Amino acid sequence: MSKYIALENLPVDLQHKGATQNESTADILKQLPHERLQAVLEKIPEEDLEVRRLLSILKKPEVVENEDVQQRRIRLAEILMVDEIDLENINNMENINGEEVDEEDDEDFFTPATSELIFARRFLINYSLERSRKRLQKEMERHQKFNTRQELLSRRTELQRMANLELAGSQLVSTKPISAVSLSTDDMVVATGSWAGDLQVLNSQTLQPLTQKLDSHVGKIGAIDWHPDSNNQMISCAEDGLIKNFQYSNEEGGLRLLGDLVGHERRISDVKYHPSGKFIGSASHDMTWRLWDASTHQELLLQEGHDKGVFSLSFQCDGSLVCSGGMDSLSMLWDIRSGSKVMTLAGHSKPIYTVAWSPNGYQVATGGGDGIINVWDIRKRDEGQLNQILAHRNIVTQVRFSKEDGGKKLVSCGYDNLINVYSSDTWLKMGSLAGHTDKIISLDISNNSHFLVSGGWDRSIKLWN
């Protein structure tokens, strides 16, 4: 008989506890699979389209009945835990999270325009020139009647009133964070979207629901925008890579889907109507922004240029320019009449999450993960940025200019749970609004600046007036 004992025959005391441990060996062993699963989950992209693509590569079903986005990620993680080879392959794949990008030449290239795009650009030339002419004429008339004393008094009164806005209402509207709020053209209703993928329309003064929750998207909703000339049509975008066009009817009490805009390959973070209402712009994590025909839902333009995902975009009031903000910490100005890049604005150290044009037509504000708001004057190409605001102690999630007064006020929100109000003359902070118990993701301001709405991680929409 051998005096040795085989390794597999060694007795294991599962109830043993170390001198500094409160857990037994059995308890620790039970936790190991969970810890491994969490480690794998951290390496898996959040975008549902990427998760489905990886499942397809592994020859697994992309979708299982009654499975939501998070359950699909967990299923992928469990598959990867079983097959270490597949895990290694995925770990070696580049650009899976948009963090690594192959180095390419920065040489500009052009593709032939379709007949639809040529027709759209001809319209945009005439439309933007006429809008610009009217805006400049209005500015000249205002200058001729300008009274310094009255102007200063009016601005001080308006800024003080804006800074003294108070919380007037709050409504819990979803089971997950509110990621988008948007006031209708007449400010009578507000549309909300959440990370649960649901849409809802509320009365903007009472916050009472006017529609049932509509499970419109799979995954997080990125943005909502109303048609500039209509109070019953809006668009939304989300993590599922889709833009959806809805018709809202107060009488029928619901939202009706008019169609989908399909083309982006990854999550869509922002969507905006062109000032004419004839076109739609979208920003996506597939490193492109795109221009669509609002009536036919046809893609007119696919614009590359950013090295990482595009998170936000905004149209200039004349309709000639668009500003895109990217995860590469750059914002870029594009002339959509010609398809050329006009300017690159570099001033953030972290990704840009929000972009907004002033109604004056020559200032654009960008907010980023560095907590800074940069305000650029595009008339001063050589001088670059006009001013830098140390706005929030964390991520700046949204910036908005006031509308009817020509952008005399700038409002922002961020992950420090605050809404800040700034004067566009001095860029000094005039006040802060505190009321959210968690991070704020989105806000919108009424046309006359008499009230604003906001939403965030506390799953509520709040009214300030």
Curated annotation (Swiss-Prot):
WD repeats lie at residues 173-212, 216-256, 263-302, 305-344, 347-386, 391-432, 435-464. PROSITE patterns: WD_REPEATS_1, WD_REPEATS_2, WD_REPEATS_REGION. The keyword Nucleus applies. InterPro entries: G-protein_beta_WD-40_rep, PRP4-like, WD40/YVTN_repeat-like_dom_sf, WD40_repeat_CS, WD40_repeat_dom_sf, WD40_rpt. It is found in: Nucleus. It comes from the Eukaryota. One of its GO terms (molecular function) is U6 snRNA binding. Its main location: nucleus. One of its GO terms (biological process) is spliceosomal complex assembly. The keyword Transferase does not apply. One of its GO terms (cellular component) is U4/U6 snRNP. Gene3D superfamilies: YVTN repeat-like/Quinoprotein amine dehydrogenase. Keywords: mRNA processing, mRNA splicing, Nucleus, Repeat, Spliceosome, WD repeat. Coiled coil: none annotated. It holds the Pfam family WD40. Present with 1770 molecules/cell in log phase SD medium. Component of the U4/U6-U5 tri-snRNP complex composed of the U4, U6 and U5 snRNAs and at least PRP3, PRP4, PRP6, PRP8, PRP18, PRP31, PRP38, SNU13, SNU23, SNU66, SNU114, SPP381, SMB1, SMD1, SMD2, SMD3, SMX2, SMX3, LSM2, LSM3, LSM4, LSM5, LSM6, LSM7, LSM8, BRR2 and DIB1. Involved in RNA splicing. Is required for the association of U4/U6 snRNP with U5 snRNP in an early step of spliceosome assembly. This is U4/U6 small nuclear ribonucleoprotein PRP4.
